Each structure stands twice: as C-alpha cells, then as structure tokens.
C-alpha cells in the first residue's frame, strides 16, 4: 500500500494536484518528497513532459516538497525540459540517472540538469564490477554537480541485483573519503 493506504501513487498525485484539497492536506510527519518511478515499463515514454507531470512539480514546489526522479537514461533531457518550466521545484535524480555507460548524450543531459540550481544527484544505483566505469562515473558526477548537491543512497536491497551493498558502499566511501556532506549533511 502507498501513503494513506492508497493502491497507486497516481491517486496521491491526483490528490496533490487538487488545489482545493492541497491547501488543507497534511502529509505524515517525515514526508519530504514524492517519487514517481519513470523508468519502469508501465510509465509511458515522455511522461515527464506531460502537463499533469509539470503541474505536479508546481504543487510540490508550492508545498516545499521535493520530487525524486528515477528516469530512463534517454529521457533525462525530457526531465531537464520539464524542470526548466518549474525552476523553484527541488528535484533529486536517483541512481546517477540510471546510467550504465558514459556516452555523450548522458553527459550532455546530466550537465544540463546540473546547471539548474535546485537539482540534486543521488550517488547510488550503479554497477560496481567495472572499476574504471565507477571511477569515470564518479569523476563525471562530482565534476558536474556542485559538491553540495551530491548525496549518497544505498539503494538497498535493490543494489544486490547488480552489486553488493558492501561493494557499492565501499566504492563511494573510498572515492569521497567518507565525506560527511555526501553521506549525511547534503540530504538534510
């Protein structure tokens, strides 16, 4: 079940966009944002360009709630275009944008996203078997996003599908030297 025992996150999204309800609605203590998985098969391509999605960003921004984005890599540019329309929206890109190869289109899209002041990147969700890829990814992410907009996330237990919790954590710890900002403070 989702929040308030709703059967779908889309119902909560509709409620959040209902302006007459939104002003009187209280979210449970500890809720700081909303996540809509945009990378799964049931999410239509181009979803983050839909008017309803942009309206959702507007409502979240007005309520000072963040949006956690879990996108397909080839739709990161779409995400940039939607966030540009709601510059006050706070957005966290999950899993470094779900990247598995560092190609030019990924780098271009992530560079554009990093240029927006309210976009953050969760350092999580990448395979760790190729150490050269990991180093190149972390070099790119840390060189593209301001240090204050990077945060660690374990992605546990899903991390076990492509790595191990320990290996993933150790890669990030070694690269960032146990930086308290990335492991704690930036998420606050």
Name these PLM-found stretches:
Residues 1-74, 81, 115, 122-128:
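Active-site gating/metal-coordination segments in enzymes
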Residues 31-38, 90-96, 119, 123, ...:
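Non-cysteine beta-strand/loop elements that form the S-adenosyl-L-methionine
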Residues 41-46, 98-101, 127-131, 158-161:
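Short, small-residue-enriched loops and turns at beta-alpha junctions
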Residues 60, 95, 121, 141, ...:
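Conserved, mostly hydrophobic/aromatic
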Residues 79-80, 102-107, 131-138, 160-172:
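Histidine/acidic-residue-rich catalytic or RNA/ligand-binding cores of hydrolases
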Residues 87, 92-119:
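Histidine/lysine/aspartate-rich catalytic loop segments that bind and position anionic ligands
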Residues 107-143, 150:
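Aromatic-anchored helix/helix-loop segment that forms the rim or "lid"
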Residues 140, 144-151, 160-188:
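Mid-to-C-terminal alpha-helical segments outside catalytic/metal-binding sites
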């Amino acid at each position: 079940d989702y929040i308030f025992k709703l059967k779908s996150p889309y119902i909560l999204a509709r409620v959040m966009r209902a302006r007459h309800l939104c002003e009187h609605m209280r979210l449970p203590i500890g809720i700081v944002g909303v996540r809509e998985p945009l990378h799964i098969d049931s999410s239509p391509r181009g979803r983050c360009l839909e008017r309803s999605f942009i309206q959702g960003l507007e409502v979240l921004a007005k309520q000072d709630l963040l949006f956690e984005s879990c996108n397909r890599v080839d739709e990161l540019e779409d995400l940039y275009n939607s966030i540009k329309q709601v510059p006050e929206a706070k957005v966290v890109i999950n899993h470094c944008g779900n990247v598995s190869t560092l190609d030019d289109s990924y780098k271009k899209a992530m560079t554009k996203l990093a240029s927006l002041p309210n976009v953050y990147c969760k350092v999580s969700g990448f395979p760790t078997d190729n150490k050269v890829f990991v180093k190149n990814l972390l070099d790119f992410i840390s060189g593209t996003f301001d240090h204050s907009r990077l945060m660690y996330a374990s992605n546990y237990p899903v991390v076990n599908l492509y790595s191990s919790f320990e290996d993933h954590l150790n890669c990030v710890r070694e690269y960032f030297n146990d930086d308290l900002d990335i492991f704690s403070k930036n998420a606050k």
